[in-house]
Amino acid sequence: VSVTVEGDFRPGNLRLRHAFGEYNGVLMGQTWSNFNSFVGNTSTLDFDSLPGLAGLQFRVAQARYTTGPLSFSLEQPQNSLIDPAGDDAADDKKDGMPAITARFEESQGGLSYSAAVLAHQVGYDTGAIDDDAFGFATFVAAKMALTDMITLQGTLTYTDGANSYLYRSGENFGAASAYVDGSGSVETLSGYGGSIGAGINLGGGRSVNIGYGYVEVDWDDAVSDLGAAAVADQSESNQAIMANYQWTPVKNVMMGVEYQFLKRENVDGSDGDANRILFAAQYNF
């Protein structure tokens, strides 16, 4: 039997990150979603990293069973939907069933790879009217060591009715999974995304990493059913380039500098972009 409890102070006060127990392949508690993999991630200084990474890059309450490279879980569902006016229908959201996931993750020589699927319910219940739909998501991720110095890695994700699991879609971390049309029916929204990157180990604790990520949500049916004005300011695509240099000046200390270019485009065609420089220092103890 093992028990893990971990917290940090990222929001300015103590928050619980992990709290779970494990016994004979059974895990119960809060930790990284089973619909998640880090094998295809490019190393970035930005805590939240690139759009399009594999699955839900968050921690959720769950019950999981692992046997060899296979793992299965029932998890706290993550979904959102918008009403016919284009507003968030969070107050009426129905989460009657857990999300169901299955993942395969393995490594052989210089290749690490992962694939997963997820299914969940997305719906609403106002007390007077209700409806729901089936949503699903899938991803693949891989990392290949080309030489002792160079690695290539990437991810691909597709969702339909599960855009909360399409990393960094929408205005923040996940776009709406569905919308309610004028007749009260739940209609799912699909999306896709991915990332690609390379890492170069320069030796002596020094490395260069560069990655690109992109996600896009298909709002065409929502525009047709709800009208362009209702979803005009919804985020249609997000993309980012991140490039960094990391070094270890002394044992247990990592420092780095990173350049980022970020761009977002809304359903109505309006867009914006930003450039920024990050500096980081990390002490491991």
Task: Describe each PLM feature range.
Residues 5-7, 28-32, 72-76, 115-119, ...:
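Transmembrane beta-barrel strands of outer-membrane/channel proteins
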Residues 238-250, 254-258:
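C-terminal structured domain segments
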Residues 20-22, 62-66, 103-105, 139-143, ...:
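Outer-membrane beta-barrel architecture
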